[in-house]
A protein has these predicted regions:
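Detector for C-terminal structural segments
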Residues: 2-3, 29, 233-237, 339-369, ...
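Ligand-site clamp/hinge motif
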Residues: 215-218, 246-297, 424, 436-438, ...
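N-terminal lobe/hinge region of extracytoplasmic solute-binding protein
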Residues: 62-113, 144, 222
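Aromatic- and charge-enriched surface segment that lines or borders ligand/interaction sites
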Residues: 108-153, 174-178, 325-327
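Gly/Pro-rich hinge or "lid" segments in bacterial periplasmic/extracellular proteins
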Residues: 195-259, 263-265, 273, 379-380, ...
Length: 571
């Protein structure tokens, strides 16, 4: 066992030592009331800095989860997208405050009026860490494989949902790439900056020729980013080292040259108390996934708490429109109205989080607040709706209709620290109006396995989707895309063509005013007309770090970048 692992275990002598080869499982704790913390500058998407940056040193950083593959285009969790963002770059950078798309590997771009053709003019000084050039042929090869996959190599079409209707990438010259779609895709510019799961980070031509199995060797996964892989130990740690010669960070970051840190060690530490103990003992320098009950104690001890709300959707309940009893709109509306959001805010969430007031996060353009209407707490109306729909109270308080109990089965992930306590609070409230909400909240690998039967086994799939664009609603709920509520022509009382048309309109224009109207129509349809989703809370990525750590960046998807990170002691 490494010296760091030994130090981590010593930091928590009263707890059973964690088997480091076990799957990542979060300890989920109910938090106390809200409080104010001394924080970094979350509004600008980076931690506070002090003085001139110091070069050198190793950042020991803890995560609840681990990389299942070094391939960033495959990633399915936060750990994978975070690490992928630091070995690869994107065509564009999205400003985390304004949402503006700004240059990165592409210096400029233009698009046709139909939003089916996007032309990018590339930087000419970018190289991969193996010395090979970044050019239009690389862009073409990446997008082709990202969208279509490669069956012979075992590569999945990871970008097929993000880039629907992709036709091809043309290469009129070495540094011009023209990306074409069969229908309008207004959200593509934002997608070109996308940094969350299954991201379009550029890989070298040599990497693209490798099979999925061969890509488990991190040394063979080559990007253009500010760091390169040194090693990868699944469920234990991933180590990155500084890329020599890097000099093309997004201009918006105003960072020149190479990263400051020599090395980053991403340590998988599933248990919240062990992450906290490791930080307070000095075994690590920073940790993501701070437990809700740990924020205030860490702040009181002088650690900096920085956070950013996740742009995209809230943590939501997808309500299955095909499966009894959520095929009944009265049940779906009762679930929306039947739980106390203020109680969740007070007993579960900290100031780093907020109760959801729409399916969209407040940071997404076009967000509308529904807290005074369909997302208010109104158990009396919820009860009346169920009464009118024929749901009668049974002897145990759970409602019954046609001899069947009002049992609603929920599948969710445990890897976000506020999930399970929030769901348990909702469970208690819904029971008061006669709904038996049964929870299955498990780590991501188990969740993914159970998700294969979501349409037939689960009334609710609790999830969220990161993307700072209102088209995330089409991505998540479009019947031909994510179809999170399983809307088909067989869904009772739902016009599937209307759903397709309303959500698809978000891809038709980049005009802000028109897009705002389309976003409202989409939210009205999902939340009010058909009650297909029950938003719960707006998640945040929360980091606690020592006061000698500076310059951790949150991007528009609330993923972290370390090109500008440094340690005062340089160690």
């Amino acid at each position: 066992m490494s010296d760091l692992r030994t130090a981590i275990e010593r930091a928590t002598p009263r707890r059973k030592r964690w088997p480091w080869v076990a799957a990542a499982v979060a300890v989920l704790l109910v938090a106390g009331g809200g409080f104010a913390l001394t924080r970094g500058d979350a509004s600008t998407g980076r931690s506070a800095t002090a003085g001139a940056p110091v070069r050198g040193g190793t950042l020991q950083f803890a995560l609840i989860d681990y990389q299942r593959s070094p391939d960033p285009q495959w990633g399915t969790n936060y750990a994978e997208s975070l690490i992928g963002n630091n070995i690869t770059d994107k065509l564009t950078w999205q400003d985390p405050d304004t949402g503006e798309i700004t240059p990165w590997l592409a210096e400029s771009w233009e698009y046709n009026k139909d939003l089916t053709e996007f032309t990018f003019h590339l930087r000419k000084d970018v190289t991969f860490s193996d010395g090979s050039p970044f050019d239009s042929e690389v862009v073409k090869a990446n997008f082709d494989q990202y969208v279509h996959g490669d069956e012979k190599l075992g590569i999945n079409p990871n970008g097929a949902i993000l880039l629907p209707g992709y036709i091809e990438t043309l290469t009129p010259d070495r540094y011009t790439a023209v990306v074409r779609f069969e229908k309008p895709l207004a959200s593509f510019l934002q997608a070109s900056s996308f940094t969350a799961n299954a991201q379009p980070g550029f890989l070298s031509l040599s990497t693209l020729k490798l099979s999925a199995e061969e890509r488990t060797d991190p040394k063979k996964v080559i990007g253009t980013g500010p760091f390169v892989y040194e090693s990868w130990q699944p469920q234990v740690k991933t180590v990155l080292v500084r890329r020599k010669g890097y000099n093309w960070a997004p201009p918006a970051l105003k960072h020149k040259g190479e990263a400051y840190l020599d090395r980053i060690v991403f340590n998988t530490i599933p248990e919240a108390s062990v992450r906290t103990g490791s930080l307070t003992s000095g075994a690590i320098d920073a940790t993501l996934d701070v437990g809700t009950t740990d924020e205030k104690p860490l702040a009181d001890q002088g650690f900096k708490i920085i956070y950013r709300g996740v742009s995209g959707t809230s943590i939501f309940f997808n309500l299955n429109s095909q499966l009894f009893p959520t095929d009944d709109i009265a049940v779906r509306r009762a679930i929306q109205l039947g739980w106390n959001r203020e109680a969740v805010r007070k007993t579960v969430l900290t100031d780093s989080y907020s109760v959801a007031t729409s399916v969209l996060a407040p940071s997404v353009p076009g967000y509308v607040d529904y807290s005074g209407t369909v997302l208010r707490y109104d158990p009396e109306k919820a009860g009346r709706l169920l009464d009118e729909a024929g749901w009668k109270e049974g002897p145990d308080g759970i409602r019954v209709k046609d001899g069947k109990k009002l049992v609603v089965k929920l599948l969710g992930i445990s890897n976000l620290v506020a999930n399970k306590p929030a769901y348990e609070s909702i469970q208690q409230d819904l029971k008061k109006i006669g709904i038996d909400l049964r929870l299955t909240v498990v780590p991501i690998p188990d969740y993914t396995a159970l998700l294969t039967k979501a349409k037939t086994d689960w009334n609710i799939v609790a999830a969220n989707r990161s993307r700072n664009d209102p088209a995330v609603l089409n991505l998540q709920y479009g019947p031909a895309l994510g179809n999170g509520s399983y809307v088909t022509k067989d869904s009772p009382g739902i016009d599937v063509d209307e759903v397709t048309r309303t959500l698809g309109a978000l891809e038709l224009t980049l005009d802000p005013a028109t897009r705002k109207q389309y976003a409202k129509a989409a939210q009205d349809l999902l939340l009010d007309k058909y009650a297909l989703v029950n938003p719960v809370y707006n998640p945040s990525q929360v980091i606690a770090h020592a006061d000698y750590v500076h310059g951790i960046i949150f991007d528009a998807q609330s993923r972290n970048h370390f090109v500008d990170t440094w340690k005062s002691n340089g160690k």
